[in-house]
Amino acid sequence: MVKLESPAYGFQGTARARAQAARWLLIGLVPAFLVCCAKTQSKPTIPAGNARFEFLTPSLVRMEYSPAGVFVDAPTAVVQKRDWPAVQVQSTQKEGWLIAATSAITLRYRLRSGPFTAANLSVTWNDPAGAAHAWHPGDVDPLNLGGLTYSLDNISKPNLPEGQMDLESPVNDMIPGIDVLLAKAKPGLLSRGGYAFIDDSQTPVWNAHRTWIEPRPQQNGQDWYLFTYNRDYQKVLKQYAELCGPIPMIPRYVLGPWITDFNFEYFPDTVESGQPAFKRYNQRYLQDEVSRLRQNLIPFDTLVLDLAWHNYGWQGGYDWSPLIAHPDELLSWLHSQGVKLSLNDHPGYANTEESILSFNDSHAPQVLKDLGRPLPPKPSFDLDISKLWSFSTDPHDQGLSHHWYATDHAEGRWKPIRIGLPWQDQGYRTYQGVGWYRASVRLPAKLPEALYVYLGEVNKTYRIFVNGKEATHSRIHWPRRLTYTDIAPYVKAGQQNEIVLRVEPGENHGGILRGPVAIRDVAPPPRIYFDLSNREQAEVFMRDLHEPLMRQGVDLWWVDGGSGAVDMPGLNKQLWTNKVFYDYTQQETGRRGFILGRYGDWGSERYPAFFTGDAYSQWPVLAYEVAFSARGGNVLVPYISHDIGGFHGAKIDFDLYARWIEFGTFSPLLRMHSAHANPREGNMRMPWVYGSQGIALMRKYFTLHTQLIPYLYTYTWLAHKESMPILRPLYLQYPELEEAYQHSHEYFFGEELLVAPVLDPSGNRTIYLPPGQWIDFFTGRRYQGGTTFTAHYAVEETPVFVREGAIIPEQSASEYSNAKPLDTLILNVYGSGKGSFDLYEDDGDSLAYTEGQYARTAMTYASSSDGFHNLIIEPTRGTFQGQGQARSYELRIHAADKPSSISVNGREVGGWMWDAGQAAAVVVLPRQSIRDRMSVTWR
């Protein structure tokens, strides 16, 4: 259960949250001091000098080596469980070897031989056919089916060359030539070799006294886990979840569609921020966008604000930008529309020294006080020079050789220029050569001893000259990139001073992009940084910067990076950043946690979900994402969120836009996003960009995704309880079927639906269907399984197939996922055969499910050889807050012959409808108590 995660972190939340955290602490930190020496023993730990072996299950073994003989019994940042049931182990010593065997594996270690190597350690086992298998330290598994990587940032066809695959990753998993990012990914848990290996040697351990993590007492030990399972893939996923922590339940509303906007930066007091486009693209624009989606009957649940909600840019502020003039009103209005709000955050982005907090942010004084750091000195001399500049192009790059930086220069065609905009936006749109800036500044007769020129953000490569001499310059990250230079040695008091800047542009933006542009007597203060592996700093970070926004009404956080905000040896920085955000928000609110974060390797399943990053809008990228999502199940990451439509790409072709939405519809998380959601372009992922065709397509698929939430939410429970991913590769369902390993661009969505998204502009799709009978989800057409076929799908169609006999529950169409109580449930049954579904429900938001407050409703469907079909809805089991006590059902019978009669609980009913084109019957069943059994029969 989630309680095994344990750390309360010392964060202060609600009384209920603190009590819950205390329970986690008590339950999750029971050490397992188990030492056994008998030849046959039920205690699973076997000491062997400086080595120790612990058999957690008959097929899962922990192997530790410590040069100092100091072993770890506390949980770590990755491994949560230490108290395991007894395992029968037979151990002997023979000719200097320790031999320990369970019913599943045999371990051999040469005693007193030092750290584990291929020469002194092995684990062997047999598969069901009796074939022997062996593992040794250092083995490379070419049969591993692959894991995930930190992100898919900037993935595109050109930057994915062939021939750079890691041997530890599958070579036949993707479209040839675009799978290089797998080389950065570690192997997953699933392998046709029948084993998985986790190295936990370096990760920090939990200190129960300090209630926080700390580095391992020694960094040169070995702490390994080996899972053996043959082809029982579900077994290894369940054991991994037991070891490293289960997938928690997520808020139900996050399964509804998401819209992202505001992908641009806001810096106050710049020329750009004062442009009319910025004044239009604001709070009112967002409300109009939401209203327009509602007016077009396009359901969605969550609005995400990207960079521009921050004042001082995406790496510098937690104040609202002036574009959100009345955030309380916006939050209240969004919540009245059934819309949740998520904000983007970049804590310690990209492992650089870029600022986490600007000194200009209103939170800075309190943060510095709480961190015990001094306030920076304020300048006593502050001369604004932003309006003194002229500019000249240098297309032949002759300015240096002709001494344009000299005070007596005569060349160049100098014209006035504004600071705060690239020169491309000031009449030099196509110019990409060297540019020169010049300002003549008269300084007073009396100057302070220290003097610095601030030149804001200069893009990109530059040199600074003062009175004809080149000055040594600095660049600090505050709040993004601030150029400043000590000019005291070069200036002349009481005279005109020439400041010259030579700039080589970067990409499409060159020059002084934003301020401050001034001369001051103090250097810029260093960044305000946080180390989230430090308990006190983590608490200040969340309490001072995030808690006020959460209390204002912000619902969840998009943790867009975090690899630079943590500093502890052996700790995965992204994993810990995700944990800090997830646990703090859960403890502060007393409700379920949820974040959009990057992937943090082992243990990431505990902190859903995984945002994959800024990919390009290309067909091969869409194909990559399909197989990548399916592979997420290999490391037990069920909630993967791609930028639907791709990030880098403005108005993409409609067929690519449509196919991406179709893929997103049959994914747990459906989130539209683009780099092109800004004042100049508008939001290029909105459906009206494509006119009525785009609106109709988004309405169709967003509505379908929302209606499927009862089905999908049941699988979130199974992900939590049974450790099974929602989006599953074919081989997870059919591990012994060779064809299941050859179709990585198909996947199961739950157990009943098979999805094969269209991946190229032709609309053609070659599809493999596993054995059995299958039915087209949209048309009702039947297919024989165990075959491969090719079909064409129009742009508004997508290949989805239902296993015959399946029961697929849906809810009624609505503006957002929880707009209506689930007092009417649509039940879709398909064809003949047998099937079952055990519907899961709870309050959708609280942690009460951990205390057993939820409900299940079992449904079974069966067909007989004499043409009778029977659906049984059993009485609902269990209760939860807000549970409805009565329900009606709308039964939809697909891929069937027209019934001659339909009866409910033995009484024939009329009024049902028959759709000959769809070969489907629809009957509305009478409303009754959820505690009553219902039987529906037709023939």
Task: Identify the residue ranges that each predicted region occupies.
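Beta-strand-rich ligand-recognition modules
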Residues: 457, 464-515, 912-933, 937-938
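A low-complexity, Ser/Thr/Gly/Pro-enriched, surface-exposed linker/loop concept
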Residues: 56-95
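Catalytic core of carbohydrate-active enzymes
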Residues: 603-610, 625, 632-642, 649-868, ...
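An acidic-aromatic loop/edge-strand motif
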Residues: 377-425, 491-523
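Solvent-exposed beta-hairpin/edge-strand motifs
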Residues: 456, 460-466, 768-779, 891-908
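Aromatic- and carboxylate-enriched substrate-binding clefts and catalytic-loop regions
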Residues: 135, 299-379, 505, 509-698, ...
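Aromatic-lined ligand-binding clefts that engage carbohydrates, nucleic acids, or primary amines
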Residues: 406, 414, 433, 441-468, ...
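Catalytic and substrate-binding clefts that recognize carbohydrates or anionic sugar/phosphate headgroups
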Residues: 93-284, 290-295, 792-814, 820-823
